């Protein structure tokens, strides 16, 4: 076969297989048998192997899985992947409707309701119609690059029907039938099964070997358009229609509703229909449909004001409590946990449930051997609601909390105004281990590859006892641990080294100072700028900071008034751990008189000197708001190269337009 004929046949096969994929995985209407599909795929794979110069990144053959990865790279989202506020009953939905109408002066509101798929949120980036990158949601700001695994999902188009640059967001999931089949295979192989389809989807997508993901038969529904160049779409429902036209799989069960009564009826309808779907849903997402109204309502730090997620009611089941286990947290709190006969609840096999504290056990008269009601909703930890007293036989055992710590044998105490028993031994191994797990966690030092399992191994091997010990770990030590090879050990040492460059707020949160959460840690870091300045702060100086109360101030002062802590900080310095704040000082910028304060700005086209993401951050730091489309409420359009249709929209609405040079002049004043 000549090169010219081979190239033509390769292109024919790609078009044919892309059509077959779309019909089967998006339209759910296959036109050929599996055998015919496989025959065409094998022919394509063979021709591409014989003619590697014709290989393409968007070939359907890529979906069988590519090269094994060493690590998932971090990806910063162009715009945050915000979580949604929750509604749990009809009253919550009506409150949401009232807030929306108040926020837009009772303008006519149309809602769009969609099924809330219980999977893994991901973003998909396309340039000129080609899929170039996919990422997990992560913490909403930073996710992980899972491009190669997403390419194995046949519901995700590798090439769109238009040469458009955009970001789509959606939910990757595992169909129920695929989940059942996968667990059957795992059981036959003597492997641990997945608890639910969501965990199976997440575990499959985060495999370093894309071939594993390719075998798992994952799918995806796209639910939103986050960034699209040169196109203004006035409503969310129209954006979903547009995504469908481009070749994405969108959920067909969405509905627009003119009133909150229609929304409630939709929720009730799908609560009944839910079991008949071949994928898990855990609620309904309700959004204001009009994009201009969405922009008018805006967002809070965590979630948009124009959307809410209705969560289906918690599921309750009865099972037998077979024992009570104690755990010691990083602050010394001793928590009892019920051990249960395994039972399926809310799509998950549950073997343990929270008992909270000793008072709850006494109040509910919970005994070992009791039949109890267990409740679970979504990701919430299962809890024991009450005892079925009618099922008691007289053989049940009363439970009494111990007087000494199960980890270190120190006497337990109950501090004033607390219900929990607490171990106050600073050398308690359980507290130290839990503290280390917290220190490396995502919102703290965020050390990739250092999870609970590895921390436990390092702790048991006596390689680490303090936070600073992490920075003395060597590759040779890691190679002594189970499941560590040359690459994984090298990657972890590098990840630990990279964490030295974190901004101060991450280190502060990681230290686990009592009462200091992630938000307070950022407040302290921004206010004092250096660890040394914070260490010297008095209780009065701390309380003078907005939102810092007496308990937190006292806790911070007490923490740093400790020789062991000061020694730890000195060790951090010696290892080169950054202890200064690297973020934007929003408080300072808000005091600067700025043109952007209170203004609504649209960025369009390519900015040469700084990216649009950086420009957005600077405008927001100076009190402005950046939106994605031009409307009559827009104050300014900043137009870079190839600005396109937004210039026409600016002219239509009589909005001022700046080029990049003028924009930079204003920023640098």
From Swiss-Prot:
Q: Which residues bind Zn(2+)?
A: 405, 408, 423, 428
Cofactor (UniProt): Mg(2+); Mn(2+)
- Give the active-site positions: 116
Which Pfam families does the record match to this protein? BRCT, DNA_ligase_aden, DNA_ligase_OB, DNA_ligase_ZBD, HHH_2, HHH_5, Nlig-Ia
- Enzyme Commission code(s) on record: 6.5.1.2
What are the GO MF terms of this UniProt record? Answer: DNA binding; DNA ligase (NAD+) activity; metal ion binding
Reactions catalysed, as given in the entry: NAD(+) + (deoxyribonucleotide)n-3'-hydroxyl + 5'-phospho-(deoxyribonucleotide)m = (deoxyribonucleotide)n+m + AMP + beta-nicotinamide D-nucleotide
Keyword Metal-binding in annotation: yes
* InterPro entries given in the database record: BRCT_dom, BRCT_dom_sf, DisA/LigA_HHH, DNA_ligase, DNA_ligase_AS, DNA_ligase_CS, DNAligase_adenylation, DNAligase_N
Q: Which cysteines are joined by disulfide bonds?
A: none
Would you kindly state one Gene Ontology biological process term found in this protein's UniProt entry? Answer: DNA repair
Keyword annotations for this protein?
A: DNA damage, DNA repair, DNA replication, Ligase, Magnesium, Manganese, Metal-binding, NAD, Zinc
The record lists NAD(+) as bound by 34-38, 83-84, 114, 137, 171, 287, 311
Gene Ontology annotations for the cellular component aspect, listed alphabetically: cytosol
SUPFAM superfamilies hit by this protein: BRCT domain, DNA ligase/mRNA capping enzyme, catalytic domain, Nucleic acid-binding proteins, RuvA domain 2-like
Q: Where is the BRCT domain?
A: 591-669
Instruction: Please tell me which top-level EC class this enzyme sits in.
Output: ligase
Q: Which family does it belong to?
A: Belongs to the NAD-dependent DNA ligase family. LigA subfamily.
Q: What does this protein do?
A: DNA ligase that catalyzes the formation of phosphodiester linkages between 5'-phosphoryl and 3'-hydroxyl groups in double-stranded DNA using NAD as a coenzyme and as the energy source for the reaction. It is essential for DNA replication and repair of damaged DNA.
Q: What is this protein called?
A: DNA ligase
What is the native source organism of this protein?
Bacillus cereus (strain AH820)
Q: Which gene encodes it?
A: ligA
């Amino acid at each position: 076969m000549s090169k010219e004929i081979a190239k033509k046949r390769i292109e024919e096969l790609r078009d044919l297989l892309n059509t077959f994929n779309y019909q089967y995985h998006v339209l759910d209407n296959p036109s050929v048998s599996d055998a015919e599909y496989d025959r065409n795929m094998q022919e394509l794979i063979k021709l591409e192997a014989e003619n590697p110069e014709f290989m393409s990144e968007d070939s359907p053959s890529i979906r069988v899985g590519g090269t094994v990865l060493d690590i998932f790279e971090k990806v910063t989202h162009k715009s945050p992947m915000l979580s949604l506020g929750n509604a749990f009953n009809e009253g919550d939905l009506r409150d949401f409707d009232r807030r929306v109408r108040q926020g837009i002066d009772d303008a006519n509101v149309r809602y769009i309701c969609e099924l809330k798929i219980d999977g893994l949120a991901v973003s998909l980036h396309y340039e000129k119609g080609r899929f170039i990158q996919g990422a997990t949601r992560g913490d909403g700001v930073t996710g992980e690059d899972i491009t190669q695994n997403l390419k194995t999902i046949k519901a995700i188009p590798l090439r769109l029907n238009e040469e458009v640059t955009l970001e789509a967001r959606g939910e990757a999931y595992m169909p129920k039938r695929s989940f059942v089949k996968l667990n059957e295979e795992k059981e036959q192989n003597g492997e641990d099964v997945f608890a639910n389809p969501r965990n199976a989807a997440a575990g499959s997508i985060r495999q370093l070997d894309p071939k594993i993901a390719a075998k798992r038969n994952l799918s995806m529904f796209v639910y939103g358009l986050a960034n699209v160049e040169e196109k203004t779409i006035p409503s969310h429902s129209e954006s979903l229609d547009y995504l469908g036209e481009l070749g994405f799989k969108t959920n067909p069960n969405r509905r627009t509703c003119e009133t909150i009564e229609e929304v409630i009826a939709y929720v009730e309808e799908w609560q009944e229909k839910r079991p008949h779907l071949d994928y898990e849903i855990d609620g309904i997402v309700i959004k204001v449909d009009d994009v201009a109204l969405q922009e008018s309502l805006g967002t809070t730090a965590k979630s948009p004001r124009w959307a809410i997620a209705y969560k289906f009611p918690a599921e309750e089941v009865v099972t037998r409590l077979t024992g009570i286990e104690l755990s010691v947290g990083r602050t010394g709190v001793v928590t009892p946990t019920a051990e249960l006969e395994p039972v399926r609840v809310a799509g998950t096999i549950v073997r343990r449930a929270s008992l909270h504290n000793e008072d709850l056990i006494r109040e509910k008269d919970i005994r070992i051997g009791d039949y109890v009601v267990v409740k679970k909703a979504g990701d919430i930890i299962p809890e024991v609601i009450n005892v079925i007293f009618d099922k008691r036989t007289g053989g049940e055992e009363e439970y009494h909390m111990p007087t000494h710590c199960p980890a270190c044998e120190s006497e337990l105490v109950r501090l004033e105004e607390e219900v929990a028993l607490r171990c106050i031994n600073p050398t308690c191994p359980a507290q130290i281990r839990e503290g280390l797990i917290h220190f490396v966690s995502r919102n703290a030092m965020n050390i990739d590859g250092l999870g609970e399992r590895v921390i436990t191994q390092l702790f048991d091997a006596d390689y680490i006892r303090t936070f600073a010990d992490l920075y003395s770990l060597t590759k040779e030590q890691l190679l002594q641990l189970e499941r560590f090879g040359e690459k994984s050990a090298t990657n972890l040492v590098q990840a630990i080294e990279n964490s030295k460059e974190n901004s101060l707020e991450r280190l502060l949160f990681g230290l686990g100072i009592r009462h200091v959460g992630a938000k307070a840690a950022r407040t302290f870091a921004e206010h004092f700028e250096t660890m040394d300045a914070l260490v010297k702060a008095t209780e009065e100086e701390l309380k003078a900071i907005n939102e810092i109360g007496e308990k937190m101030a006292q806790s911070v002062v007490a923490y740093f008034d400790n020789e062991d802590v000061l020694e730890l900080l000195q060790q951090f310095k010696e290892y080169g751990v950054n202890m200064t704040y690297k973020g934007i000082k929003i408080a300072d910028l808000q005091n600067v008189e700025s043109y952007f304060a209170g203004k609504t700005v649209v960025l369009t086209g390519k900015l040469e000197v700084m990216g649009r993401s950086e420009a957005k951050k600077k405008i927001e730091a100076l009190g402005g708001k950046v939106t994605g489309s031009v409307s009559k409420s827009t104050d300014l359009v900043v137009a870079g190269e190839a600005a396109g249709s937004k210039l026409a929209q600016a002219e239509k609405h009589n909005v001022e337009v700046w080029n990049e040079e003028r924009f930079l002049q204003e920023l640098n004043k």
